[in-house]
Amino acid sequence: MKHEYKFWDWILNMINKQRYGELSWYIDNKEKYLEFKNQEEARAWGIKNYKHWADKYKQVMQMSNMVIKGCMYKKPLECYCGYSYRQINEFLRYDKDNKSHTYRELADILSMVLCSAPRVPQDLVLYRMVNDEFVNRLIENNKNTPPTPIQEKGFMSTSLLKSITNQNEPYAKEKNLLKIFVPKNTIGVYVNAVTSRSEEEMLLFPNMYLGLVSYPYNDKETKKIVFECELIGIYW
C-alpha cells in the first residue's frame, strides 16, 4: 500500500512539474513563521510593534499642515489606503503619472514613510488575493530557464489573516490566495496602527519579488487555490 501511495505521489509530482515548472525556492522550516489565527492575535501583535511609530508618524504629519499645501501629501499612508493606491501603483508599475507628477511624489514620500517604520520583527506569514493574470505570470516565470521570481513593482498590500477571503471587497472574489513567507527585517507597516482597516493590513515596500515554494493546492476552509511564495527583497 505504501508503494502505491509513493507511486501516485510521484505521478502527481510529475504532473505538477509539467504544469508549474520546477520548484527553485524552498522554505527550510515553515513552522518558525508566525501565523495568526484570529483578529485579536493579529491586532495585538500589530499594535505592540507599530503603535509607537504610528503615533510619531501622526505627529509629524500634523506638524506638516503648517507648510504643506496638498492634502494628499499630509497623510500619504491614509491616502494610499483610501483611493490613491491605484494611481500610485500605476506610476510604479507603468510610469504613468499626471502633469504635476503627483503620484511619483506620493510614491517617494510613502517609500520614506515605510523606511522610517520598524522592520518586521520576526519571520511572518502574510496573505494576498490575486487575479488569474498574476498567477499566470507567476507560473510563466517559474517555468523559465532558469526560473525567475515575479516582481511586484508597486507597494504590496497584504493581510495578517487568511480570513481576508471573507472581506466584502472586490478582491475577495478572486479564486487565488497567496500565502507569503516574509523574512524578518522586511520593510513594512501595520496599517491599522494608523488608520482603521478591516483586513488587518500589512503594507510592504515596493520592488519585492515572489518565488513559488510549493505547488498550488485547494484550501477547504477558504475554498481558494493557495500559492505559497517566498518574499524576496532586494535590499537585505
Q: Predicted segments — roles?
A:
Residues M1-M156, L160-S163, D219-W236:
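N-terminal subdomain
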